[in-house]
Amino acid sequence: MENQVKTADSSAMEDRSLSQTELRMDALSRGGKLFIWSLRYWLVAVRLKQPPASSLRDAYVAAGCAEGEILIDEVMSLIGVASKRPVEIRCCCEMCLSEDETLLLSCLRLLQAGEVDKAATELDALMVPALSRSVCRIADQYRGLLINAGLSLTSPRQFTVVT
């Protein structure tokens, strides 16, 4: 599974210049930040041979959505075994999301909008289509936990004061 879900290597991170199209962590809602942080921290826990759900538990209890860590573990485990190619999950300290992290966040946002078929179709590009719906079911449960805790996946627009 670790071969399919990977971090960006440090040389690639050094060579990469900030793209206008990359989504930044500071532009995400609290729910979006928690989701991306969880993907990244899940991978760190797997690499350290620690149980990922246990490693994430305190953050989810503090966020008011206990059991979110279990759903993240299920989603990431399924993606790890069913992905068609290596999935890029970036280092916890990275400010910009990878294309794969952006795709996963987009799928959650589609689920929040009730667009289950569209979310599954987007996931088909990343993983074996037969399991896309399973990931969507689990991700939708996760989305529900976030919403019940007051953590939306869509961020408010960036506002500036105009005088």
Report residues per predicted region.
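Polar/charged low-complexity regulatory segments
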Residues: 1-163
